[in-house]
């Protein structure tokens, strides 16, 4: 929590810098040359990039400590939080027919959720989808376990790609005026895009591909990794 406070404090300082810079750019200081304004803008962008790097490192450290999922809420966007809540409800109630119509990354997340639910792997009843995506063997680990390229920052948007193709973003971030937050909702499709190519080559449906990937990952740990996961887990 102390580290989160430090990040917020640094964010406030950067926000103040942005405000002062905008005042200078509005004509309040007409004598400021264009080159000086550009230099000031670049300095702010560099500060925001450093803060983004530190925020991401702190998020990964928080995940590694295995803390409660709600400890990760300050690191993700509000839109991502609502999306995860909705996706958890889908996992609890949506039928095979409806689930099959969803994009691949959501099908994979829902089926993995149902596997965890069936095997009683969840340690909490809150923010379970967030826990699932960020936990060991979760979707986020597909990229965080690989060498990553330098961070890119452009105004209020940030991104991170793989080291071998740093200009192709796989994780997105949003600046919310005081801090950086990970845009999980729009990052997950980018992370799983490479996996989808497997299904295209083999001419599989999204559900067939999801079953294949889950069976490959968990076949030595659990049984019945099959189409039964396309339907909600019985509460009985």
Named regions from a protein language model:
Residues 2-12:
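Bacterial N-terminal signal peptides that target proteins for export
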Residues 138, 143-177, 181-236:
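Low-complexity, intrinsically disordered terminal/linker segments enriched in charged
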Residues 25-70, 74, 78-85, 226-229:
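Short, low-complexity N-terminal intrinsically disordered segments enriched in polar/charged residues
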Residues 21-22:
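C-terminal motif of bacterial Sec signal peptides marking the signal peptidase cleavage site
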Residues 46, 53, 69-148:
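Short solvent-exposed beta->alpha transition segments
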Residues 14, 37-39, 149-150:
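A short alpha-helix capping/helix-coil boundary motif
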Residues 11, 15, 63, 70, ...:
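Short, flexible helical or helix-coil boundary motifs
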């Amino acid at each position: 929590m102390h580290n989160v406070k430090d990040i917020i404090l640094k964010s406030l300082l950067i926000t103040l810098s942005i405000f002062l810079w905008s005042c200078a750019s509005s004509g309040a200081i007409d004598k400021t040359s264009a080159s000086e304004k550009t230099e000031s803008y670049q300095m702010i962008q560099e500060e925001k990039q450093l803060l983004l790097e530190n925020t991401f490192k702190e998020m990964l450290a928080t995940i590694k400590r295995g803390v409660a999922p709600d400890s990760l809420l300050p690191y993700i966007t509000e839109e991502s939080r609502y999306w995860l809540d909705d996706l958890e409800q889908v996992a609890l109630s949506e039928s095979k027919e409806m689930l099959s119509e969803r994009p691949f990354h959501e099908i994979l997340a829902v089926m993995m959720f149902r596997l965890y639910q069936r095997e009683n792997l969840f340690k909490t009843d809150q923010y379970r989808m967030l826990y699932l995506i960020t936990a060991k063997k979760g979707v986020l680990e597909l990229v965080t376990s690989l060498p990553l390229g330098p961070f890119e920052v452009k105004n209020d948007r940030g991104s991170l790609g793989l080291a071998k193709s740093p200009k192709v973003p796989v994780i997105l971030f949003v600046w919310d005026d005081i801090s950086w937050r990970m845009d999980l909702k729009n990052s997950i499709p980018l992370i799983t895009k490479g996996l989808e190519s497997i299904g295209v080559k083999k001419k599989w449906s999204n559900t067939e591909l999801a079953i294949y990937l889950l069976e490959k990952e968990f076949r030595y740990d659990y049984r019945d990794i099959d189409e039964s996961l396309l339907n909600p887990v019985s509460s009985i």
